[in-house]
Amino acid sequence: QAYLEKIEKLRINYPVVSGELNFVFPGCYTTQVETKKANRRLENLLLEAEKFSSLARLSGARDYYPDRDIDESWKIVLRNQFHDILDGSAIGPVYEEVTESYQEAEKRARRALNFSLKTLANLIETRGEGSPLIVFNSLPWERTEPVEARLVFNTPVEAVKILDASGAETPVQLLELKEESGQWTAEVLFMAKNVPSLGYKTYRVLPAKSRGKYKSQLTASSRILENEFIRLTLDPETGWWKSLFDKKTGREFLAASGNVLEAIADEPEGMSAWETGLKEVVEKLGEKGASVKFIEKGPVRATLRVEQLFRSSKFVQDIQLYAGLPRVDIRLWLNWQERNVMVKAAFPVALNRPLATFEIPFGAINRPATGNEVPALKWIDLSDEAGQAGLSLLNDSRYGFDVKDNTMRISLVRGATYPDPEADRGQHQLAYALYPHQGNWKQGLSFRRGLEFNQPLLAEQALI
């Protein structure tokens, strides 16, 4: 304090530096992706645990807050944010220990969250027919989104029916049904509507003799997914997106083939965990052929599966569209075996002189579309110069991006060789999504869409 007071008295006209500092070590945005994924997952999970633990404590149903579990989990997350761990520049054995520590943090965080959700669910009036299912919203605005829930029954079931609080039947998609040790479990998918801010909505689950027949605006074929908002068309030979059409505005959002996975030579001059050496695109996955299969069509979700090969690696994408949701989801599984290559998903956007915006901690920033590898959090956005429309790219676990003119790309995986020669070799899962919107990113609420993609609605089967 004394130092600051003395400086203030000097009244020197200090120079002001406005804007970001130079980007350093862009390879760190994508190296060791499983560590980065665990970091994102734990950050989201702990925020949910804190919110619902506080609500459970304030409800008066208990005088206990799981501070030890939450504190110890945060300590692990923060320790792993040390610059040689989270940035991906440690040696291989470090990440074996880090994986174990994240598992411990997740166990503690989930224990705190689940205990709090059960406490709150048991306070809710749930008398009535069937089994109560409570859907919780961890974000501070009302949401209508898909929910996946695991339901347990003590008697045999052949199908499931879900009713809302008014008794109206809600379209439900049965994903899996199995019997084990005298209990029957059903994995279901349904659209929860108007779940209140930091609140809940109650549904009732009943066994059914057969799967329900519901009206749905969701249609699908071997190359087209369509709902009331979006029509997505794929090339059945390559798996590339040929059209992303906004039905509400009549706008085509792709200027050329989209969701093209580009394998790029990545040959930095040393320090490959830290640095990139991006050169030419050596292959566009799918240009040598791809498998495109129509694997799922229900009243809630339809899915096309795209399988593509690159050298010794395999990429499997489930491209999903939900009834009532203006967003296309991509769930990606990959077996990565390459070195000195980076793979990005590219989206050329049909917008006039677009402005590139990137989410940063506690805000968003505009950057020039020069093609440099830059960091961002849960979303980036391209909106046209007039602010009439835009396209947001959401993600659940990636931090490296680039925008060149009207093409935005997300960095999915790379093959660094130093200090860990086996960095990122093996199996990975991730998710990203495209969200077309009217207006710019603020008017389109892209910041909310990024949070929703990372913190889906939570379902808890309550005690009767």
What is each residue range found by the language model?
Residues Q1-I7:
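Hydrophobic, mid-to-C-terminal alpha-helical segments
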Residues I7-L123, G128-E129:
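Metal- or metallocofactor-binding catalytic centers and their adjacent structured scaffolds
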Residues L10-I12, V17, K107, N114, ...:
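C-terminal (or distal) subdomains of carbohydrate-active enzymes
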